[in-house]
Amino acid sequence: MASPALISETEAWKDLKSHLEGIKKTHLRELMGDTERCQSMMVEFDNIFLDYSRQQASPDTISKLYKLADEAHLKQKIDRMYNGDHINSTENRSVLHVALRASRNSAISSDGKNVVPDVWNVLDKIKDFSDRARNGSWVGATGKELKDVIAVGIGGSFLGPLFVHTALQTDPEASKNARGRELRFLANVDPIDVARNISGLNPETTLVVVVSKTFTTAETMLNARTLREWISSALGPSAVAKHMVAVSTNLPLVEKFGIDPNNAFAFWDWVGGRYSVCSAVGVLPLSLQYGFAVVEKFLQGAHSIDQHFSSAPFEKNIPVLLGLLSVWNVSFLGYPARAILPYSQALEKLAPHIQQVSMESNGKGVSIDGLPLPFESGEIDFGEPGTNGQHSFYQLIHQGRVIPCDFIGVVKSQQPVYLKGEVVNNHDELMSNFFAQPDALAYGKTPEQLKKENVSEHLIPHKTFTGNRPSLSILLPTLDAYRIGQLLAIYEHRVAVQGFVWGINSFDQWGVELGKSLATQVRKQLHASRVKGEPVEEGFNFSTKTLLTRYLEATSDVPADPSTLLPNI
């Protein structure tokens, strides 16, 4: 008998639907009272501790989710990814970001070729170049050391590396290696972003890394041309070859741009942008800032989770458990969002990165076979470090919409502070909130409890917390390069699990194309209006025509053929 075309047509899905009503009637207060249940919902790998006992789920729920995974052929799909099968079917590509952090002696194939040697050729090239840039044997056009780096890219070429950079900045080993150096990321085509990035920097000591696989990405290449002008206007056109390098596979365009093709670092079609932080996209700028040895530890951390994900049984497999719980929360309990709440300021850029990884991967309305999905899939991801988020949006999480939460804590702070006479140290104060918030969400506070506290009758409705709000807790032992790599890989694989179960293609992103193609039409109109004085006429609806006309009239002082003007800040 043929497999159902949609996962929602399977017996396991229908069984979970039937099971749902009983779970909805059971409060987390009751579920949390079962010690045996709680103990069964705790998993540890390599000192990473996952507690998902505060999910609206019983052991029976979890068993049924395993059956759903089996009917979705989850293990086979994971194996197909690792084997280099073209699981990105709409673009006919392998999905092999795991190869980017594989050990040198590994064998991972795409189209019959072991890609690991190519990966390590690029890593060795990055190590050599970053070592030379850091020790002063590669210098700028005027002989000065290149201590400042601007990485130019957008989307996955920016969010992932920025997350890792921000997390490493306060790590003792990494920060020591980065002393006297600066790494910035230019992503937005907004000239304000250019101004902020070059502010306070000297072209003589700045190296620009242009990240674009095809070297045609509109925003990235305009920003790259802007920085090329910034360098050449200060140091002369010949300086570009000393101050700009590329992460790209289009060597002819790299050379035409003025960058020496020998200073281009490759990556491959089997690397999706949002999964590219472990390629030259992230490894090159991060190695220039922190040294290759630190970044290699980051890669090793990601690799450790890759091995865990591919080999651990589902009951002990952290990414699989997280992915299945997300499917349960989204498609069965009907919760559309997820809050990512790291209790570490070093992880402040985790949520924006995972927002892209998750929402660009799983924000799909059709199955991998093109069938409309009759169920909800994908999550709205957002987050903020604790305790800042508590003073921002936790109000809604506690007393408004139900939003499942990921609490991420770190046992040992990167930068401990101790003050004599304080009741607890700064990190203990932070972690007090990490431990308290999940219970507040789960248990809530009843009107009866408030009455016992002599709360005024008219305030009781306002101070009541319904509880029964699901969360999970991840406790990391430390936050060094290795653990940052592990955390990244956990979330990458969690997202893949969700997509595999939902039966969607988590590795394409056709949704970004339509807006870009329409922007081409607008760009042509802006050029025609500025240069030829043509009014906004054909091809636009009334609303867009009105907005465009208003914009052009208000910026009529912009010259048709302006002289070069760079930000002055």
Curated annotation (Swiss-Prot):
Active-site residues, Swiss-Prot/TrEMBL: E360, H391, K516
Gene3D superfamilies attached to this UniProt entry: 1.10.1390.10, Glucose-6-phosphate isomerase like protein, domain 1
GO molecular function, one term: glucose-6-phosphate isomerase activity
Reaction catalyzed: alpha-D-glucose 6-phosphate = beta-D-fructose 6-phosphate
Location of this chain's protein in the cell: Cytoplasm
PANTHER family: GLUCOSE-6-PHOSPHATE ISOMERASE
Name of the protein: Glucose-6-phosphate isomerase, cytosolic 1
Naturally occurring in which organism (per UniProt): Clarkia concinna (Red ribbons)
